[in-house]
Design a protein with these regions (language model features):
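Non-catalytic, C-terminal membrane-associated alpha-helical segments of glycosyltransferases
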Residues: 225-228, 232, 239-309
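A conserved acidic beta->alpha catalytic loop
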Residues: 38-48, 93-94
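A recurrent flexible, glycine/aromatic-enriched loop bordering the glycosyltransferase active site
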Residues: 146-166, 182
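Glycine-rich, basic loop-to-helix element that forms the pyrophosphate-binding segment
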Residues: 64-81
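Acidic donor-binding loop at a coil-to-helix junction in glycosyltransferase catalytic cores
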Residues: 182-189
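Short, well-formed alpha-helical segments that are part of the catalytic scaffolds
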Residues: 13-26
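Short aromatic/hydrophobic "clamp" motif used to bind/position activated sugar donors
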Residues: 86
């Protein structure tokens, strides 16, 4: 039986986080411990965690709001783990069944050193978000490496740490997640792993409930940050175009909406897609924009306060 810890960064955790702890505690392969790295001690209710009476130990570490960094905060949490494997999750992802951890660790071998889960939409997700999850997380598992870039394009390095398992030895060898990055720390890690000759597995059998109904402006900000990351790491993303993948998703979503009799959703799809494209386009050219506009467009405003644009 493989020994594994679960790492969860939190910020103002709500009831879904406590459901997550409850479901992790009842896994067929339970974690050795759950490591919570929480931003803002005043927002965390440790008594509520104790009230769950979990069999799995929950270890909580607090950081200040201005200390949070997508990569570095997770790296810090990994240092509290001594298991040969660890799983990174977000506070709003819920295991769909008791086999999540078991399925996540099953593909690990001499070549596969990162396995990420399938995300299926929450019950309240709309038609557009449902199709987006279906598009990004198909029913068939995948093995990806440097040799599969021609097959998967920009998605070759896609390995969402909403729910993903990592092998400690290779993680330490690579140096962990890239610190002080605006976003995409999970993709950057997957790319570094592949460049070391290792492989990434998308495991469709490992399933979590996770989806968002983002507004157009939120989509703009998120895609702005994604594009900024791609500009800042040109050597990694060179030759891997996101635009074509985006067009395929939009056209596929439109066809799906017509097929299920939801053509009335097309205007919203056009609006959301336009916001995504505008954000991505602006992010690709962020170096030419005034600092106030860059900060306005970004969803990670703290990042720009610590950085000269």
């Amino acid at each position: 039986m493989k020994c594994v810890d679960v790492i969860i960064p939190t910020y103002k955790p709500d009831q879904k986080f406590f459901q997550l702890l409850h479901r992790l505690d009842r896994q067929s392969l339970p974690p050795q411990k759950i490591i919570v790295i929480n931003t803002g001690k005043e927002f965390f209710d440790e008594e509520a965690v104790d009230a769950l009476h979990l069999q799995t130990p929950v270890e909580v570490h607090h950081i200040e709001v201005d200390e949070f960094d997508h990569g570095q905060t997770r790296n810090q949490a990994v240092k509290y783990s001594h298991a040969p494997y660890f799983i990174c999750m977000t506070q709003d992802a819920l295991p769909a069944n008791q086999k999540l951890i078991e399925h996540l660790l099953a593909p690990m071998d001499e070549e596969v050193k990162l396995v990420y889960a399938r995300q299926v939409p929450n019950q309240d997700a709309g038609h557009i978000e449902r199709y987006t999850r279906q598009y990004n997380y198909p029913k068939k598992s995948q093995i990806k490496s440097e040799k599969t870039k021609a097959v998967y394009g920009i998605k070759n390095y896609f390995a969402s740490n909403v729910c993903a398992a990592y092998e400690r030895e290779s993680f330490v060898e690579i140096g962990g997640f890239v610190p002080k990055t605006i976003l995409n720390e999970d993709m950057l890690y997957a790319a570094a792993l592949m460049k070391k000759g290792k492989k990434v597995c998308y495991c469709a059998d490992a399933v979590v409930f996770h989806s968002h109904e983002y507004s157009g402006l939120r989509q703009l900000s998120r895609n702005f940050d994604i594009a900024v990351s791609q500009v800042q790491y040109k050597d990694i993303f060179a030759g891997l175009k996101s635009e074509k993948e985006g067009i395929r998703l939009v056209l596929g979503t439109a066809r799906h909406l017509f097929k299920i009799g939801q053509a009335k959703e097309i205007p919203r799809l056009v609006y959301i897609s336009g916001c995504k494209y505008l954000g991505f386009f602006m992010g690709k050219h962020y170096e030419k924009l005034p600092k106030w506009l860059v900060k306005k467009c970004s969803s990670n405003k703290k990042y720009w306060e610590k950085k000269d644009v």
